Regions:
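Active-site beta-loop-alpha junctions enriched in small/polar residues
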Residues: 174, 203-207, 274-278, 341-345, ...
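Extracytoplasmic/secreted cell-surface and envelope-processing proteins
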Residues: 62, 179, 208-210, 279-281, ...
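Feature activates predominantly on carbohydrate-active enzymes
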Residues: 100-335, 390, 394, 488, ...
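Active-site neighborhood of glycoside hydrolase catalytic domains
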Residues: 282-288, 292, 297-417, 422-434
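Contiguous, structured surface segment used for ligand recognition
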Residues: 19-164, 506
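Short glycine/serine/threonine/alanine-rich loop segments
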Residues: 79, 195, 265-267, 400, ...
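Bacterial Sec-dependent N-terminal signal peptides
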Residues: 1-28
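Flexible, acidic glycine-rich loops studded with aromatic residues
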Residues: 401-417, 422-514
Length: 515
């Protein structure tokens, strides 16, 4: 595959304005995402066995990054970089620590005799190396020696730093389980394009994918379904299933290894444990967590929104506290994503327990619109806010903060919650204007399960239509946003919902190059 295509992955992030010359240069050099500044120079730096590698002796993490570069050049180019204390009078690749630069920023200077990579923090050096890789032949990403490639780097001056602190991609592994090998590949792709958050969607109606030792039935029962929808999902459309059991989950040891691997590439793994909706996989394992434990629940073989949700009972809260205790030990991330989306209130309206709890808590239907979103919310909406706030308090007590989909705005927002805005941009803007951090991930701009070509010629998807141009044109901070909103919109994220992505290859097809 041509370099210009292979590097056009995961580039909806780090959007930065630049002059026309910079734009043309970025196109010429195929650097993704486009750097803040790129200035072409004359000549090329030739990589060979005479090149020295210079790294500060008192920066062990930077030395590790430089060593990885040297190892990859040895593997793919057959070039052995010689270590040196100084670049003076030598043809060298030099890593220079410079205080005061942006935390994740870097400068890359290439002349015919010297490559200088300057940053203040290890992740800045890591991102600079990713840019250097993109200036090299595509063979640099391989695992075999390629003596035919042109192992040289064009002379150039590059300066870059990210616009957002959260630059993420969500992978849904519930609707279709993803083999562990692909998880590592996925992380590699994020790292290659300087993304720093892997949002791991681990629980849903269609499967529970994380081992919880206190509750073994979650994976014994909740990780499996008897069949899977394979044709279009429409209410009045005949549903066709494959008739095959589908399942899989990740052990805690596997998760620890993934988290460590991601950390080595400066990627934070944020787990998502859905509540109070999208509960069927858990209810199939533990029906006492529902509002009607006499029912039989099954892991869903199809998509959609289901009325069977978690009951806001002490049993449920004790369950989630036990789950979160184990999740916290696996994920060092500051954030835990608690879902909060698409929670129908029918079961709560019909539950004597829930209605009694509503009265006990003094919850009432709104008589005036909410100051946050301008909508009158029901007492059941406020019960969801109680659910979310209670879990937030527990996680806060463990040193964690929560992220939730924008429905957590309904009925009142938990004090320290970050909102992930998926139903358009309004949720994120409302949260930001109210002083809460927001991550923009709006449907349809960054929903990668949508069609990207004419449906008549494309594989089956969930629907929608989202072109490459539409995705790339999205600006997460509207031009008319006030200063408070600008301050609190902390990032952007693409979402890969895998309703019809049965294989890793299909996932790649849907995700790229839009992601």
């Amino acid at each position: 595959m041509k370099k210009s295509i292979s590097l056009l992955l995961l580039s909806l992030l780090m959007i930065t304005p630049s002059c026309q010359k910079t734009k043309e240069a970025a196109n010429e050099y195929n650097i993704v995402p486009k750097p803040n500044q790129i200035l072409p120079q004359e000549g090329r730096f030739e990589l060979n066995n005479k090149v020295c590698l210079v790294v500060p002796s008192d920066a062990p993490e930077v030395k590790s990054i430089a060593a990885s570069l040297a190892e990859q050049l040895k593997l793919t180019a057959g070039i052995s970089l010689k270590e040196a204390e100084s670049a003076d009078g030598k043809t060298a690749i030099s890593f220079v620590v410079q205080e005061g630069m942006p935390k994740e920023g870097y400068k890359l200077s290439v002349t015919p005799s010297l490559i200088t990579l300057t940053a203040s923090q290890p992740n800045g050096f890591f991102y600079g190396v990713q840019t250097l890789y993109q200036l090299l032949p595509p063979a640099i990403y391989g695992k075999q020696l390629d003596k035919k490639a042109d192992w040289s780097v064009p002379a150039v001056e590059i300066e870059d730093s990210p616009r957002f602190v959260h630059r993420g991609l969500m992978l849904d592994v519930c609707r279709h389980y993803v083999p562990i090998d692909y998880i590592y590949k996925f992380i590699d792709l994020l790292a290659m394009n300087k993304m720093n958050v892997f949002h791991w969607h681990l629980t849903d109606d269609q499967g529970w994918r994380i081992e919880i030792k206190k509750y073994p039935k979650l994976t014994e029962i909740g990780s499996k379904r008897e069949k899977t929808l394979v044709d279009y999902y429409y209410v009045n459309y005949p549903q066709i299933f494959d008739g095959k059991e589908h399942g899989g989950y990740y052990t805690q040891e596997q998760i620890k290894d993934v988290v460590a691997y991601a950390a080595s590439k400066y990627i934070n793994v944020v787990p998502e444990i859905e509540m109070p909706g999208h509960a069927l996989a858990a209810l199939a394992a533990y029906p006492e967590l529902s509002c009607d434990s006499t029912q039989t629940y099954k892991v869903s073989p199809t998509w959609g929104v289901f009325e069977q949700v978690f009951c806001p009972s002490e049993t449920t809260f004790k369950f989630f506290e036990g789950v979160m205790d184990e999740v916290i030990e696996l994920f060092p991330s500051e954030y835990i994503h608690i879902g909060g989306d698409e929670c129908p209130k029918t079961a709560w309206k019909n539950s004597a327990f829930c209605q009694q709890l509503i009265r006990q808590l003094g919850l009432k239907d709104d008589t005036t619109p909410s100051k946050i979103d301008g909508i009158k919310h029901s007492k059941e909406d406020k019960l969801q806010s109680y659910f979310v706030t209670r879990m937030e308090k527990y996680l806060n007590s463990k040193g964690k903060n929560i992220i939730g989909w924008d429905e957590i705005l309904e009925g009142g927002l938990a004090p320290n919650a970050t909102v992930m805005s998926w139903r358009g941009v309004e949720g994120g803007m409302n949260a930001a204007k109210a002083g809460h951090n927001a991550i923009m991930t709006p449907n349809p701009y960054v929903y990668l399960d949508y069609y990207q070509e004419e449906p008549e010629i494309a594989p089956t998807t969930i629907g929608g239509y989202n072109t490459l141009k539409k995705t790339y044109s999205y600006n997460p901070v509207p031009d008319d946003a006030d200063e408070l909103a600008k301050k609190h919109i902390i990032g952007i994220q693409g979402n890969i919902w895998r309703e019809y992505m049965q294989t890793s290859e299909r996932t790649d097809y849907q995700a790229f190059p839009r992601a």
